[in-house]
């Protein structure tokens, strides 16, 4: 058997426990995020106090926002995630790979041995450069492909560019999304509604269609859904619709592509501390108390979802398809 497919009983049990219980091998102390210093702990930690809790300072950025300007800065696994070679030699394309869950997945994939191409909105270049440097620091190939996912021609070009630069594709993560809070449906213009739909629904449709020409048995497609698909809030009318649609395209496409040996799964985050929230995704009042409604009483950090994206792409998850994996601090479904 190939090395990447071989796993001992002990390492399998240990690995599964680690994947399901935590987002990284070495956790981060909560106060580290406020000081931008990272302290590693090898012991157990209370998940309720592991990361910053509300109230948060008032802050606002133009859409789509930058990780580097958030306070506290999110943990995307820059210093907390340690890989074990689970994705050695794999080739991944991640949309929205500059920040949030996409950034966490990109860092984790590189540290698990994968080459990674990331897409991002052109104004996010500052964050994207950091991710590219982190990928290269692991000795992996890093490809930056900025562009607007509302453009069908660009989405096809994105896939072609990534496949050419990486010499193939094994993992496709449709993660990029637009989220803007509106008190009423009357406040949403047709242009804004179209922007959300094009980014969150059309783009994955175009990207997956283009990617199928490169995908072989054993590859993985992963979509980022949301707790909003199951428990939508009144102020995210358009965004919540797209996440319900994401959940259903994952389940439908998984059945369609299973005979081809292609797995399709999703991740459904709850309230996660990302640039999406500070750039119009939440009202200032909700932002100050962000995550307080969860049983854990705090928002999640992108790094806490990184291992889920790794697990769904790994060979030892070969029987998992059409599944939605939640990470929401105890609220919502699944």
Model-derived segments and spans:
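N-terminal secretory signal peptides and thylakoid transit peptides that target proteins
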Residues: 2-20
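Short C-terminal tail/terminal secondary-structure segment
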Residues: 70, 78-79, 182, 309-310, ...
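Catalytic loop of short-chain dehydrogenase/reductase
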Residues: 177-179, 222-259, 271-272
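Substrate-binding pocket helix/loop in short-chain dehydrogenase/reductase
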Residues: 183-185, 189-194, 290
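Alpha-helical segment proximal to the catalytic Tyr-Lys
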Residues: 213-214, 255-256, 318
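A glycine/serine/threonine-rich, flexible loop-to-helix segment
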Residues: 235-237, 259, 271-294, 304
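Short, small/polar-rich loop/turn modules that mediate ligand/substrate recognition or access, typified
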Residues: 258, 263, 320-322
């Amino acid at each position: 058997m190939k090395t990447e497919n071989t796993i001992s009983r002990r390492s399998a049990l240990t690995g599964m426990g680690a994947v399901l219980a935590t987002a990284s091998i070495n956790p981060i102390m909560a106060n580290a995020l406020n000081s931008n210093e990272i302290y590693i702990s090898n012991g157990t930690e209370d998940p309720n106090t592991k990361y910053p809790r509300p109230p948060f300072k008032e802050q606002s950025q133009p859409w789509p926002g930058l990780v580097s300007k958030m306070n506290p800065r999110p943990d995307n696994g820059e210093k907390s995630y340690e890989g074990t070679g689970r994705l050695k030699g794999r080739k991944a394309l991640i949309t929205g790979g500059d920040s949030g869950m996409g950034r966490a997945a990109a860092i984790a994939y590189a540290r698990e041995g994968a080459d990674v191409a990331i897409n991002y909105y052109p104004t996010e270049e500052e964050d994207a450069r950091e991710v590219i440097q982190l990928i290269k620091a692991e000795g992996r190939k890093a490809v930056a492909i900025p562009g607007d996912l509302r453009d069908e021609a660009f989405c096809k070009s994105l896939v072609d560019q990534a496949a050419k630069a990486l010499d193939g594709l094994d993992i496709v993560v449709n993660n990029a999304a637009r989220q803007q809070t509106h008190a009423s449906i009357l406040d949403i213009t047709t242009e804004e509604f179209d922007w959300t739909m094009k980014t969150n629904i059309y783009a994955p449709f175009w990207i997956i269609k283009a990617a199928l020409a490169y995908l072989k048995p054993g590859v993985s497609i992963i979509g980022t859904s949301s707790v909003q698909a199951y428990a939508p809030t009144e102020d995210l009318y358009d965004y919540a619709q797209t996440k319900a649609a994401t959940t259903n395209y994952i389940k439908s496409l998984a059945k369609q592509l299973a005979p081809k040996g292609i797995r399709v799964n999703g991740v459904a985050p709850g309230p996660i501390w990302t640039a999406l929230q500070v750039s119009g995704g939440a009202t200032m009042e909700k932002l100050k108390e962000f995550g307080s409604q969860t049983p854990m009483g705090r928002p999640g950090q992108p790094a806490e979802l990184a291992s889920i994206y790794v697990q769904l792409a790994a060979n030892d998850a070969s029987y998992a398809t059409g599944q939605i994996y939640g990470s929401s601090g105890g609220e919502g479904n699944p």
